[in-house]
A protein has these predicted regions:
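N-terminal Rossmann-like NAD(P)+-binding subdomain of aldehyde/semialdehyde dehydrogenases
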Residues: 1-93
Length: 93
């Protein structure tokens, strides 16, 4: 069965994610584990640059992320914007 993200306000499907086979899921888990092995060996100074960049991208796209949070969780748009900005600040720290 596919997974659906549903807007709690109007019941409309925001996005449908296809069901994965056991093999597909195992492959994704293996990829994540391999990425972690690389990440944990990355110096903190380089990780900080990467995470800060994620914060910059989040800040640059705050309205896009806020809209998505509103659609998926029924949050008020201004509340969602505030949460996105707060999260971006944490990443920048």
């Amino acid at each position: 069965m596919a997974y659906e993200s549903v807007n709690p306000y109007d019941g409309k499907t925001v996005k449908t994610f296809p069901e994965l086979t056991d093999e597909q899921l195992e492959a994704k888990i293996a990829t994540a584990a391999a990425c972690y092995e690389t990440w944990k060996k990355t110096p903190y100074s380089k990780r900080a640059v990467i995470v800060a960049r994620a914060g910059e991208l989040m800040r640059a796209n705050v309205d896009k992320f806020a809209k998505l949070a509103t659609l998926e969780m029924g949050k008020l748009i201004n509340e969602a914007r505030g949460e996105m900005s707060f999260s971006a600040n944490i990443l920048a720290y």
